[in-house]
């Protein structure tokens, strides 16, 4: 429907789709955090590690950078039992959900059988399972392998509770929470919205401004005209 330029009835909630109207960025963030921390795990039995928050943009109150800070505070707060490392402005803590943001063919890993190999790739998502501040490394569990990161390599990791829609391409998640608030026009395209909603396997929740979704559906020509580079530059300045 969206891909054909048709407007769904966002007022019709169903078993696999819900719309929560939040016109202010702060209330949108609060709702997303509450959904991830309590409402979906308790009411729908979907654990937080099977929920993916998506946003068109990195920047702004409802962008992924701020969402990840808020979600880390709610889902993996500081604890004496969890070691952490401050890298730039980012705190990496045992238990954090992280994503590899560039191909690295030299990272050493071991699989569950103890077999060693090398290489972690852009878009791989895992969990920090060990933070060794004395030896200065993190271990990240990517489900099929555990990779070792020296602290000097932490610029290759970002938190991954919230991802941009662009970074989610090619992946699917049990539940998707989509943050929709005004950002740069070239990020609000039909293609971005279609990509976001098709990431959800069982449940999609839109949180934000319905008008943004309608604008995205109508913005088809622009999605063709702007290059990926221009979209990325717009995101960096939003």
Locate the predicted segments by residue.
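Conserved helicase motor core of P-loop NTPases
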Residues: 1-118
């Amino acid at each position: 429907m969206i891909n054909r330029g048709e407007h769904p009835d966002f007022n019709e909630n169903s078993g696999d789709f819900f719309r929560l109207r939040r016109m202010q960025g702060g209330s949108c963030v609060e709702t997303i955090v509450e959904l991830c921390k309590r409402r979906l795990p308790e009411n729908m039995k979907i654990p937080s590690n099977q929920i993916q928050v998506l946003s068109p943009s990195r920047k702004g109150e409802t962008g992924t950078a701020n969402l990840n800070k808020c979600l880390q505070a709610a889902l993996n707060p500081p604890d004496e039992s969890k070691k952490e490392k401050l890298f730039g402005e980012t705190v990496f803590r045992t238990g954090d959900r992280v994503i590899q943001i560039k191909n690295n063919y030299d990272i050493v890993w071991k699989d569950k059988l103890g077999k060693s190999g090398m290489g972690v790739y852009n878009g791989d998502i895992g969990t920090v399972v060990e933070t060794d501040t004395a030896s200065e490394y993190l271990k990240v569990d990517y489900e099929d392998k555990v990779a070792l990161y020296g602290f000097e390599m932490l610029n290759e990791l970002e938190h991954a509770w919230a991802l941009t829609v662009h970074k989610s391409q090619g992946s699917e998640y049990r539940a998707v929470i989509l943050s929709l608030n005004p950002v740069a026009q070239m990020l609000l395209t039909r293609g971005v919205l279609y990509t976001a909603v098709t990431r959800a396997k069982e449940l999609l929740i839109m949180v934000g401004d319905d008008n943004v979704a309608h604008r995205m559906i109508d913005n088809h020509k622009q999605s063709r005209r702007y290059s990926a580079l221009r979209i990325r530059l717009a995101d960096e300045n939003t």
